[in-house]
Structure formats: C-alpha cells, structure tokens
Swiss-Prot record:
Involved in control of chromosome replication initiation. Inhibits the cooperative binding of DnaA to the oriC region, thus negatively regulating initiation of chromosome replication. Inhibits the ability of DnaA-ATP to form a helix on DNA; does not disassemble preformed DnaA-DNA helices. Decreases the residence time of DnaA on the chromosome at its binding sites (oriC, replication forks and promoter-binding sites). Tethers DnaA to the replication machinery via the DNA polymerase beta sliding clamp subunit (dnaN). Keywords: Cytoplasm, DNA replication, DNA replication inhibitor, Metal-binding, Zinc. Zn(2+) binds at H90, C92, C106, C109. Its cofactor is Zn(2+). This is Replication initiation control protein YabA. Homotetramer. Interacts with both DnaA and DnaN, acting as a bridge between these two proteins. Its main location: cytoplasm. The keyword Mitochondrion does not apply. The gene is yabA. Binds 1 zinc ion per subunit. Belongs to the YabA family. It holds the Pfam family YabA.
Length: 116
C-alpha cells in the first residue's frame, strides 16, 4: 500500500468516527429527554390515579401516614449532590468529581438523582 492510500483510508475512518460520535451524542440527548419525560409522566400518572380514586377522608389520611413512613427523608447530602451536578460536576460513581464536558447531561448522574 502506498502512503496516499493509507492517508485516504485514515481520513475516511476519521470521518466515519466523527459521524458515529455525532449520532451517539444525538442518541444520548434523546435518551436523557425520554428519561426525564418518563419521570414527569410517572408523577402525573400518580396524581391522576389519586384524583380518580379519591377514597373517603379516613382512608386518605391512613394512606398519607403510610406514605410518609415509607418515603425516605431527602437529606442534606442529596441536596449537596444535586447542587454539585447543577454546577457542572459528575456525581455518578463512574466519573465522580470530574467536570461534565460542555455542560452535557450524564445519564448515570441523572439516574442517580431520579432514584426513588
């Protein structure tokens, strides 16, 4: 193989890698959007179910008490991690503490923040 053919092949490979990188970035954005949309739809679903089945007052009070007992308290640590993420740092175990590139969302960090 001559040098020109090798150079051409490397250039073509570089272009394909660039295209794949752009495509992967687009898929990552779509996935982040879908995760966020799923989270909001889940919340909306819960609210609609609550409205549809509005039980008697006593049952509602009992359910609220059980719900309060089940829900874990969101503490100061969670707030600190959310603040760090908003400031542009990773909070996932994979890249913890490093800066997020170009302020892009990290799916691992988002899944950590959206845990129930």
């Amino acid at each position: 193989m001559n040098k020109k053919a090798i150079f051409t092949q490397v250039s073509q490979l570089e272009e394909r890698i660039g295209e794949l990188h752009r495509e992967l970035g687009g898929l990552k954005e779509q996935l982040a959007y879908l995760i966020e949309e799923n989270h909001f739809l889940t919340i909306e679903n819960e609210h609609l179910r609550e409205r549809l089945g509005e039980p008697e007052l006593e049952e509602t009070e009992e359910k609220e008490q059980v719900t309060k007992e089940r829900k874990p308290f969101v503490g100061e640590g969670y707030d600190n991690l959310a603040r760090l993420y908003q400031e542009g740092f990773h909070i996932c175990n994979t890249h913890y503490g490093s800066l997020r590139k170009n302020g892009e969302d990290c799916l691992f960090c988002l899944s950590f923040l959206n845990q129930d």
